[in-house]
């Protein structure tokens, strides 16, 4: 289909941008939904379902909890001196030794998990006048009665249990973690049978702290054939400090210390299988990619992970505003420029030209403006990731029953942080999308203005993104306009001459209306004059008589 007013002495050049039949809706500051040619999802909403063992060292706890592995439960001996970046506790983990409790369980678990090692150093404690290496049928090691391998159960020797007073200095340059305990017999008879005294006492001190525990004698629910309990305590001895242990009974003594390390190690409860793969980010649901800035898989993470948000989807515009091409038009229609719609089928660029001249029609992309837009958009995703990825882990928070209010406060703080980040993510993406659309629109306008400045008076802006060129412009001429080498002076005289000739025949639509109305008014006036003259002539000849009655 020819463009209006086109012939061999003129040409038409239209500027346009890429469009797709079905774009993607994104949110901007000014619009909740605006269609763009392309967008990237920013929220990771699914996991692989498995925990990758690379680059992080993953230690599968299997049927052992971290504390059981720490104490040396017989069925956890395989974990002695192990190290990890992430210790994975399973839901089927169980204890299989003398029943115990840890009054500050969460703190001990977190301390050991962050240390990332169960490296144990045996020390030569001297326990005089007592029997060492006590055991229980509740803690079988093979066919024999046993006990926690990292603890030493001290009982009476003969009929005496002397007061124990032992010191152990820390002459090294690292922190030492000592695990010790207090036995709570189920009856008074058990108390005297094991420790002679009717009531024991255990005091463990350093220069910075002191703990004194008095056993609580009494029956408790039976667990693995035992109604007594052991309470587990722990003490950290700094370099240059001294550990002092004083007791007259009921002491579960340390055999040595755990070497403490500082680092980013952690612990996570998960039943996801561990597999040979690579992933920087781990959640209880499994590993997730960290190529997106946000995720809503799980609040608990380890490694370099996307920020957790509430949204299921946030789309970042990576293309321009999409205005699908009207399908009723061909390559050239009544309106072919970017003002009304985009162009589908532009596979080699975002912006381009369509022309019609004496040699036919054609289309070509403008790579300069396309590259300028792409360069500004390409770094957006990486910049958003850099702003949001956490280079640390979000650990599980655990509190005892007496710390219920602290737990509620912690939950409130975490929920508030998530709400804040979810809002920030929404605003951040909306701002980036607004910028993308504005800059792609700007590149289109720059290309149009650059073309208009080249053509000057040799062409007329048709108001729809097209120029009517008033001189013969073959394909070489069109190419010179596209690449910026067009010389308007060469065609100036021809363009002016053709413009005057065409304007002598063509009338712009605005003047046509005025002329039509004026012509209609003059015609009506002349018709009235002729009709009135005929009536007056007829009256004079007597052919018409007029009677006026009052």
Curated annotation (Swiss-Prot):
SUPFAM superfamilies listed in its UniProt record: Influenza hemagglutinin (stalk), Viral protein domain
GO terms (BP aspect): clathrin-dependent endocytosis of virus by host cell; fusion of virus membrane with host endosome membrane; fusion of virus membrane with host plasma membrane; virion attachment to host cell
Cystine residue pairs: 14-466, 52-277, 64-76, 97-139, 281-305, 473-477
Gene Ontology terms for molecular function: host cell surface receptor binding
Subcellular location(s) of the protein: Virion membrane; Host apical cell membrane
GO annotations of cellular component type: host cell plasma membrane; membrane; viral envelope; virion membrane
InterPro entries per record: Capsid_hemagglutn, Hemagglutn_HA1_a/b_dom_sf, Hemagglutn_influenz_A, Hemagglutn_influenz_A/B
Keyword Lipoprotein in annotation: yes
Domain of life, per lineage: Viruses
Mod. after translation: Palmitoylated.
Cytoplasmic face of the membrane: 536-550
Segments on the Extracellular face: 1-514
Residues bearing carbohydrate: 8, 22, 38, 165, 285, 483
Record's keyword annotation contains Amino-acid biosynthesis: no
Membrane-spanning parts: 515-535
Lipidation (S-palmitoyl cysteine): 539, 546, 549
Site, as annotated: Cleavage: 329-330
Keywords, sorted A to Z: Clathrin- and caveolin-independent endocytosis of virus by host, Clathrin-mediated endocytosis of virus by host, Disulfide bond, Fusion of virus membrane with host endosomal membrane, Fusion of virus membrane with host membrane, Glycoprotein, Hemagglutinin, Host cell membrane, Host membrane, Host-virus interaction, Lipoprotein, Membrane, Palmitate, Transmembrane, Transmembrane helix, Viral attachment to host cell, Viral envelope protein, Viral penetration into host cytoplasm, Virion, Virus endocytosis by host, Virus entry into host cell
Membrane topology: Single-pass type I membrane protein
A Pfam family recorded for this sequence: Hemagglutinin
Purpose of the protein: Binds to sialic acid-containing receptors on the cell surface, bringing about the attachment of the virus particle to the cell. This attachment induces virion internalization either through clathrin-dependent endocytosis or through clathrin- and caveolin-independent pathway. Plays a major role in the determination of host range restriction and virulence. Class I viral fusion protein. Responsible for penetration of the virus into the cell cytoplasm by mediating the fusion of the membrane of the endocytosed virus particle with the endosomal membrane.
Extra remark beyond the main annotation: Major glycoprotein, comprises over 80% of the envelope proteins present in virus particle. The extent of infection into host organism is determined by HA. Influenza viruses bud from the apical surface of polarized epithelial cells (e.g. bronchial epithelial cells) into lumen of lungs and are therefore usually pneumotropic. The reason is that HA is cleaved by tryptase clara which is restricted to lungs. However, HAs of H5 and H7 pantropic avian viruses subtypes can be cleaved by furin and subtilisin-type enzymes, allowing the virus to grow in other organs than lungs.
Assembly with partners or alone: Homotrimer of disulfide-linked HA1-HA2.
Family in the record: Belongs to the influenza viruses hemagglutinin family.
Protein known as: Hemagglutinin
Naturally occurring in which organism (per UniProt): Influenza A virus (strain A/Duck/Hokkaido/10/1985 H3N8)
UniProt lineage: Viruses, Riboviria, Orthornavirae, Negarnaviricota, Polyploviricotina
Gene giving rise to this polypeptide: HA
């Amino acid at each position: 289909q020819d463009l209006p007013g086109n012939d061999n002495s003129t040409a038409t050049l239209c500027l346009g941008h890429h469009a797709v039949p079905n774009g993607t809706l994104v949110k901007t500051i000014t619009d909740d939904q605006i269609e763009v040619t392309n967008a990237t999802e920013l929220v990771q909403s699914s996991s692989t379902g498995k925990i990758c063992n690379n680059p992080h060292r993953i230690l599968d706890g299997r049927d052992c909890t971290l504390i059981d592995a720490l104490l040396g439960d017989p069925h956890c001996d395989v974990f002695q001196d192990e190290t990890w970046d992430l210790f994975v506790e399973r839901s089927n983990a169980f204890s299989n030794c003398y029943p115990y409790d840890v009054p500050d369980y969460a703190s001990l678990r977190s301390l050991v998990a962050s240390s990332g090692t169960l490296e144990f150093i045996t020390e030569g404690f001297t326990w005089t006048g007592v029997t060492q290496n006590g055991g229980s049928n509740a803690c079988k090691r093979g066919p024999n009665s046993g006990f926690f391998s990292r603890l030493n159960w001290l009982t009476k020797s003969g009929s005496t249990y002397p007061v124990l007073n032992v010191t152990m200095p820390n002459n090294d340059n690292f922190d030492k973690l000592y695990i010790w305990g207090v036995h709570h017999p189920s009856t008074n008879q058990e108390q005297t049978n094991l420790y002679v005294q009717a009531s024991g006492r255990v005091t463990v001190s350093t220069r910075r702290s002191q703990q004194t525990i008095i056993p609580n004698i009494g029956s408790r629910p039976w667990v693995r054939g035992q109604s007594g309990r052991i309470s587990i305590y722990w003490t950290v001895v700094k370099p240059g400090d001294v550990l002092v242990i004083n007791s007259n009974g009921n002491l579960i003594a340390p055999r040595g210390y755990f070497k403490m390390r500082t680092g980013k190690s952690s612990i996570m409860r998960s039943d996801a299988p561990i597999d040979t793969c690579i992933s920087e980010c781990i959640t209880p649901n499994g590993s997730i990619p960290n190529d997106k800035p946000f995720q809503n898989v799980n609040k608990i993470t380890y490694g370099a992970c996307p920020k957790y948000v509430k949204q299921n989807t946030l789309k970042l515009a990576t293309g321009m505003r999409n205005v699908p091409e009207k399908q009723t038009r061909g390559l050239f229609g009544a309106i072919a420029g970017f003002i009304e719609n985009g162009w589908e089928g532009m596979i080699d660029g975002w912006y381009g030209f369509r022309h019609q001249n004496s040699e036919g029609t054609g289309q070509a992309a403008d790579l300069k403006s396309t590259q300028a837009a792409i360069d500004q958009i390409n770094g957006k995703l990486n910049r958003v990731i850099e702003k949001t990825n956490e280079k640390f882990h979000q650990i599980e928070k655990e509190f005892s029953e007496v710390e219920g209010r602290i737990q509620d406060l912690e939950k409130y703080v975490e929920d508030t942080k998530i709400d804040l980040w979810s809002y920030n993510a929404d605003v951040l993406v909306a701002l980036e999308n607004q910028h993308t659309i504005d800059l792609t629109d700007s590149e289109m306008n720059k290309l149009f203005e650059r073309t208009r400045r080249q053509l000057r008076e040799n062409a007329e802006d048709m108001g729809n993104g097209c120029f009517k060129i008033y001189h013969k412009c073959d394909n070489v001429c069109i190419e010179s306009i596209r690449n910026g080498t067009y010389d308007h002076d060469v065609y100036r005289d021809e363009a002016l001459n053709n413009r005057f000739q065409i304007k002598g025949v063509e009338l712009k639509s605005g003047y046509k209306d005025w002329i039509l109305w004026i012509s209609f008014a003059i015609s009506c006036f002349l018709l009235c004059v002729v009709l009135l003259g005929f009536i007056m002539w007829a009256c004079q000849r007597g052919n018409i008589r007029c009677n006026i009655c009052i």
